[in-house]
Amino acid sequence: MTEVEERINAWNDGFEELLSYIPAKLYYREHTANQWKQKKSTLEEKKERRKMKFSLDGLVNDADDDSQKSSKWEQSSTMSDDTDVSDRHAESMSQIRGKLASKIQDLREKRKAGDLNQKRQNKRPVENEKDSQKGSGKSKVQKKKHKASPRAGF
């Protein structure tokens, strides 16, 4: 067993020597050191983020953030015509928002008008059913109760 242990130790020493030639920055990540120092978000911060997610003001702020992020990216990638591109991006976003708001409003108006028409149409057949039931003298529920089932004898 001593020979085996000596061989293993020799291999281990050789392997450790090879590893010593590799700089540590190649196999250790820098951001892992900060990973454990990061604070967890508090309950209030989570609530604020959730509110911003569903509020219209949050959409405006997100669009501003997106335009700032995109403009930073454009500045780093290309230095020419960066103001024209960011202006077009901001204009297109505002136009899209305007179109979306108008479509939503149109759909709401159509829905209100459609609901009124449906309510009117739904009331008419109900009145007709009542008239037909009055003439027969028995309601549909009473007719079903008196009907014998085919398995009544079993």
Curated annotation (Swiss-Prot):
Q: Say which domain of life the source belongs to.
A: Eukaryota
Identification of the protein by name: Ribosomal RNA-processing protein 14-N
Primary location recorded for the protein, binned into one broad class: nucleus
Q: Which residues carry this modification: Phosphothreonine?
A: 83
Give the GO cellular component terms, alphabetically: nucleolus; nucleus
What is its subcellular localisation? Answer: Nucleus, Nucleolus
Which regions are flagged for Basic residues bias?
Answer: 140-154
Q: Which family does it belong to?
A: Belongs to the SURF6 family.
The Gene Ontology terms for molecular function here are: DNA binding; RNA binding
Basic and acidic residues compositional bias: what residue ranges? 105-133
Q: What does the record give as the function of this protein?
A: Involved in ribosome biogenesis and cell polarity. Required for the synthesis of both 40S and 60S ribosomal subunits and may also play some direct role in correct positioning of the mitotic spindle during mitosis.
One biological-process term from Gene Ontology?
A: ribosomal large subunit biogenesis
Which positions bear Phosphoserine? 80
Q: Which UniProt keywords apply?
A: Nucleus, Phosphoprotein, Ribosome biogenesis, rRNA processing
Its source organism is: Schizosaccharomyces pombe (strain 972 / ATCC 24843)
The region called Disordered is annotated at: 36-154
